[in-house]
């Protein structure tokens, strides 16, 4: 239904779209974890965020937590937002890597750089169970926030179906 909705959005009027699906194959209908690019797709279709969250029983997510990914008992949180803030001369990660090297060489205290995830607002907010929508101004730390959704995928499919059928 994503393809049908996208085609319905850009196709000339009176274009006939045929979608082939089998009623014999049931919908799994579990919660679906998305990534931030789905927001761009929904914007393209003109689907408002509040409508999506209401109709699909959705919530926000700030990243993906990979539990037991590397090995049992280990986890890795992949945030959607950006790390720190770049300067005109350097990317943030280059500055952090330099501080880390200085700490390893004993030039500064070993714990001075901290861990890189401490410099990612999405990671810190997720650990604390907090969320605030991003702000457009680059002057605020909230401008580094990126997010996605977790919602009922069956409901999202129904929403896209209605969208495509209304335009076809």
Predicted regions located by residue number:
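A short, surface-exposed helix-loop junction/capping segment
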Residues: 17-22, 136-145
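Glycine-rich FAD pyrophosphate-binding loop
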Residues: 6-30
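A conserved beta-strand/loop element that lines the FAD pocket in flavoprotein oxidoreductases
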Residues: 164-168
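Dinucleotide-binding Rossmann-like beta1-alpha1 core, especially the glycine-rich loop
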Residues: 33-123
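Active-site catalytic microenvironments for nucleophilic, acid-base chemistry
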Residues: 6-10, 44, 163
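General structural concept
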Residues: 18-20, 52, 155
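Short beta-strand to alpha-helix junction loop
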Residues: 143-162
């Amino acid at each position: 239904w994503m393809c049908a909705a996208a085609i319905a959005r850009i196709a000339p009027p009176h274009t006939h779209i045929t979608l082939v699906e089998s009623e014999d194959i049931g919908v799994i209908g579990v919660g679906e974890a998305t990534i931030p690019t789905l927001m761009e797709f929904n914007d393209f279709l003109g689907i408002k965020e509040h409508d999506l969250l209401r109709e699909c029983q959705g919530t926000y997510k700030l990243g993906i937590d990979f539990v037991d990914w590397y090995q049992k008992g280990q986890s890795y949180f992949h945030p959607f937002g950006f790390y720190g803030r770049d300067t005109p001369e350097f990317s943030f990660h280059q500055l952090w890597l330099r501080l880390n090297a200085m700490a390893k060489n004993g030039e500064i205290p070993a714990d001075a750089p901290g861990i890189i995830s401490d410099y990612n607002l999405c990671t810190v907010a997720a650990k604390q169970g907090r969320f605030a929508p991003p702000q457009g101004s680059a002057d605020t730390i909230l401008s580094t926030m990126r997010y996605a959704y977790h919602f009922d995928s069956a409901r999202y499919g129904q929403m896209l179906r209605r969208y495509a059928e209304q335009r076809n």
